[in-house]
Amino acid sequence: MKKLLCGLLCLLMLLGCASAEGYLYSAKGDNGLWGHIDEAGNWVIPPKFDGAGDFRGNYAWIQQGDREGFANRDGEIVLLLDENVVADSGYDGFYYGGRETGIWLLYKEATGKNSLGTEWLEGFFDVQSGVYSGLKWRGVNHRESNSRLIAVADETGKWGYVSRDTGEMVIPAKYDSDNMGSNFYDGYAVVTFWDDDYNIVQTLLLDETGKEYPLPEGINAAYCDSVISDGLFEVVDENGLYGYCNTSGEVVIEPQFAYAFEFEDGYAAVELTDGTCGVIDQTGNVVMRTTDSLHVQIRHGCYVLPTGEHSFTMYSVAGEELFTLQGENIVELWTPEENGLCMYVVEKGRQRRCGWVNMQGKIISEAKWTFPEYDQPGVYFPSGLQAVYDIDGTRLAGYLDESGELAIPLQFSFVTQFYGKLAYVGMVQDDGTT
């Protein structure tokens, strides 16, 4: 029998899930070494590494002795890093730049003062091209974008752009940022220049050739590292009022709000100058206004407002009241997932448990579950099943389906979400081992 990661690899074939051809999963062989299997459990890369992770794009993290590196789908080691270089795939379940489209962030702790004036040297390994940039930057923007350019900071702290296909700088580092630089979205990045007091004094739209487009006089990005969403980004005028520009550099929603958030699915949350909060459409029309002090989260055309003690109401962005959920100790109701299910949270003392309600307001699963903390937060039912822990009862884990039923019974000591057709799970054996 194959000895797989954490004891067992669940081989459920998920009906109706998206095609997962090409997924390869890390597994531990009888020889104590690691390789990769396909969805049928067949060895594709025989166990020969001291350590291995799942494939991201065309490459997988591997370890040989004290050195980390990467292997391709033929099992060939394409890069072995120096012993003190660390490859970081992400944190708290997030994959840097996306599982299939992103990077591994690489860094090396420097000994003593180095040319960057920082304790870390950073670089990246691209999951699609297999390009290793080398460790030569003060920072790398690992956030997701749909561009083959990535923002990096040089030794002065200025930001520019490197090709993920060559590892070479293509737009010189000269822009200011208080965080990670602005990545490209739909062909454009929002870049800024500061004064000596770190105030934004000029904002430009930048295309992928390096051409700069100024914004109208008196208009600047509302924040460093602005994200272009739905073709718009937040700006602020000389009076401190917020509005929106498009990727042509035109102000399409005049500055008029006390605060503004990015657009999603055609709508954005704003704070108005009278202290109320609301939702606007892409013309700037206020489609909802509330005196509630909480900023509204808009997702999949819906938002939630508290409507009493332990009571929450789901609305459409058109203002239609969809349903109200009320119950003892309910403290949160989330906007719907793509499958139309909404998570709600019950809090008793310091304990929080989650359940699910459909868009008719019917509870399909009582709030008694917690989720794997190492899976990507905010992503639920990724392949039609949701990994759950029964902390207060059996203290075991299983999988809910979209009807709220346990499709895979509570039997595991730990679980992960399904990726493709397989998920890693663990079971406690009779001798107490996992």
Where are these regions (language model features)?
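Residue-level detector of conserved, function-critical positions
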Residues: E21-T434
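Positively charged n-region of N-terminal signal peptides that target proteins for export
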Residues: M1-L9
